[in-house]
UniProtKB/Swiss-Prot annotation:
InterPro entries: Rce1/LyrA-like_dom
Gene: lyrA
Protein name in UniProt: Lysostaphin resistance protein A
A biological process term (GO) from this entry: CAAX-box protein maturation
Single GO MF descriptor: endopeptidase activity
Signal peptide interval: none
Length: 471
C-alpha cells in the first residue's frame, strides 16, 4: 500500500471528477469521429477521454508529485517479466476462446472482421495509440490514486467497475451489454494484477496487454457487429483467465511470504498480508518504548537528586567559613570598640586624677604641668585672666585663643606654642599672676569637667594627640 497519503476529501474528488470527465467526454468526441479520416477500429476519438480527464485532475489538484508517481518511463527486470506475461495472457485467452468457439459453434473462420480495407500497420499503430491513451488515464493515474488509500487488489476491483462502466457497449442487446461489462471488468482485473509492485512503471505493461487484446478482437472475432455468442465466448474466456491468474499469483505470494520468510516489501509493495501483524508489533514497540522511558526517568531523577545533594553540601561548606569569618570580624570590631571605649574612659580618669591632685600654682613648674594637661577651655580661661592683666601686650595672643575657642578645631601644636609663650610671660610677671591664680583655682573644677566631656566626644585621633603631650 502506498505510504504517500492524499487528504480523504481530495482523494474522493479526484476519483469523482476523473470518472465524470472520462464518461462525459466520449459523448462530445463521438461527434468529432466523422471529421477524422480513420475507422473506429483504427482510432476511436473516445479513447482521448481518460487522458484528458487525468490531465485535468493533475492540473487542478495539489500533490502533483504523488499524482505523477505512477507515470515512470524507466524499465526494470520486473517490468520486462510482466511485459512478456502481458503478451502471453492474451494468447492464452484467444486460444481458449477459439477452442470454445469451435466446440459450441458450427465453424470458426479466421479474419471474420468485415470491411477490413486498411493496412495492418495502420491498425497496429492505431491500436497502440488508443491503448496508451486509455491505460495512461485508468491504470497509470486512476489506479495509482485509488491505491494510496487501499490495497492493490481492492483498488483493481474499484477501477475495474469504473472501467467496465466506461467501456461497456450498450448499442446492441442487453445480453451483449452484460457480457461486454464482464469482459471489461475481467480485462481490468488482469491489468491490475500485472502492474502490481512495479513501482510506477505501469504504462508499458498495461499498453502491451491492451494492445494485444484489442488487436486479437479485431482480427479473430466479430463481436463489434453485435454477435452475442462471440462476445459471450470472449467474456467467459477472459474471466476464467483472470480468476486463474489472480489465484496463482496469490498462492505464489503466500508461499514466498510464509515459507521463505521474505519481507513482502521486496516481493511487492501493496500486499494486504503485510499489515496482518501490524497491531501486535505496534503494541510491542509501544511497551518497549514505555519501559525504556520509565528507566530513563528513574536514572534522571536519581542523577538530579545526587546533583542536588552535592550542590547543597557545597553551598553549606561555603557558608560555614563565611559565617565564621563574619563572626570573627564582628567580634574583632566589638573588641576594638570596647578597647577604644576603655582607652577613652582611662584618659578621662587620668585627667580627673591630674586635676584633683594639682598643687597650688605658686611655682613655675606646677604652672607648666597644668598648662600641658589642661584642655583648650582651661587654656582659654587662663588667657582671659592674663588678658585682663595685660591687655595691650598680649592682644595678639588673646585673638589667637579666642579664634581657637570659637572654632574648636585648632591643632595641638598651636596650643603648645601658645602655652610656652604664656609661660614665658607669666614667669616675668609672677607677682601680677598670683592674684589671678585664685580666680583660676575657682574656675578650674568647672573647666576640668568640661574638658573631660569634650575629650569623651572627640575622636581617637585627638586622644592619641593628648597622650603624646603627656610625656
Amino acid at each position: 500500500m502506498n505510504t504517500k497519503r492524499i487528504p480523504g476529501f481530495q482523494w474522493a474528488m479526484m476519483i469523482f471528477i476523473f470518472f465524470i470527465v472520462a464518461y462525459a467526454l466520449p459523448i462530445i468526441l463521438k461527434d468529432l469521429q466523422s471529421s477524422v479520416p480513420f475507422k473506429d477500429f483504427v482510432f476511436d476519438m473516445s479513447t482521448l477521454a481518460p487522458f484528458i480527464a487525468a490531465f485535468i485532475c493533475i492540473a487542478i489538484f495539489s500533490h502533483r508529485g504523488t499524482q505523477l508517481a505512477s507515470l515512470k518511463l524507466t524499465i526494470s527486470l520486473k517490468v520486462i517479466e510482466r511485459a512478456i506475461l502481458a503478451l502471453i495472457l492474451p494468447l492464452i485467452i484467444f486460444i481458449i476462446a477459439m477452442v470454445c468457439f469451435n466446440i459450441f459453434s458450427d465453424s470458426f473462420v479466421l479474419l471474420q472482421t468485415k470491411d477490413l480495407s486498411v493496412s495492418i500497420s495502420s491498425i497496429i499503430i492505431g491500436q497502440i495509440v488508443m491503448a496508451f491513451l486509455v491505460e495512461l488515464g485508468f491504470r497509470s493515474y486512476l489506479q495509482h490514486i485509488v491505491e494510496t488509500k487501499m490495497n492493490t487488489f481492492f483498488a483493481s476491483i474499484i477501477v475495474g467497475f469504473m472501467y467496465a462502466i466506461w467501456n461497456v457497449n450498450i448499442a446492441f442487446s442487453f445480453d451483449f451489454a452484460i457480457y461486454s461489462f464482464l469482459y471489461s471488468f475481467a480485462f481490468s482485473m488482469i491489468i491490475g494484477e500485472l502492474i502490481r509492485a512495479t513501482k510506477g512503471r505501469t504504462i508499458y505493461i498495461a499498453t502491451l496487454f491492451h494492445f494485444a487484446m484489442s488487436f486479437g478482437l479485431v482480427f479473430l472475432f466479430n463481436e463489434e457487429l453485435g454477435e452475442v455468442f462471440a462476445m459471450k465466448v470472449i467474456a467467459l474466456s477472459t474471466a476464467a483467465v483472470a480468476i486463474l491468474y489472480i489465484l496463482i499469483s496469490l498462492i505464489i505470494r503466500t508461499i514466498l511470504y510464509f515459507f521463505t520468510k521474505r519481507n513482502l516489501d521486496e516481493v511487492e509493495e501493496n500486499n494486504y498480508l503485510d499489515h496482518v501483524n501490524d497491531t501486535d508489533e505496534d503494541l510491542t514497540d509501544v511497551g518497549d518504548e514505555y519501559n525504556v522511558s520509565e528507566t530513563d526517568e528513574t536514572h534522571h531523577s536519581a542523577n538530579v537528586n545526587a546533583a542536588t545533594a552535592e550542590t547543597s553540601s557545597e553551598v553549606q561548606d561555603k557558608e560555614d567559613p563565611t559565617d565564621r569569618h563574619h563572626e570573627s570580624n564582628a567580634s574583632d570590631q566589638d573588641n576594638q570598640y570596647n578597647s577604644t571605649e576603655d582607652t577613652a574612659h582611662e584618659d578621662d580618669s587620668r585627667a580627673n586624677i591630674i586635676s584633683e591632685n594639682t598643687p597650688s600654682p605658686s611655682s613655675n613648674d606646677s604652672t607648666k604641668v597644668d598648662a600641658k594637661h589642661s584642655d583648650s577651655r582651661a587654656n582659654s580661661a587662663v588667657e582671659a585672666s592674663t588678658e585682663k592683666a595685660h591687655p595691650e601686650s598680649d592682644q595678639d595672643e588673646v585673638k589667637v585663643n579666642s579664634r581657637y575657642t570659637s572654632n574648636r578645631q585648632s591643632s595641638v601644636v598651636s596650643d603648645a606654642r601658645t602655652t610656652i609663650d604664656e609661660e614665658s610671660d607669666e614667669s616675668s610677671r609672677h607677682l601680677s599672676s598670683e592674684s589671678d591664680d585664685v580666680t583660676q583655682q575657682d574656675n578650674q573644677p568647672l573647666d576640668t569637667a568640661d574638658s573631660s566631656n569634650a575629650d569623651y566626644e572627640r575622636s581617637p585621633f585627638d586622644l592619641k594627640s593628648k597622650r603624646g603631650h603627656r610625656s
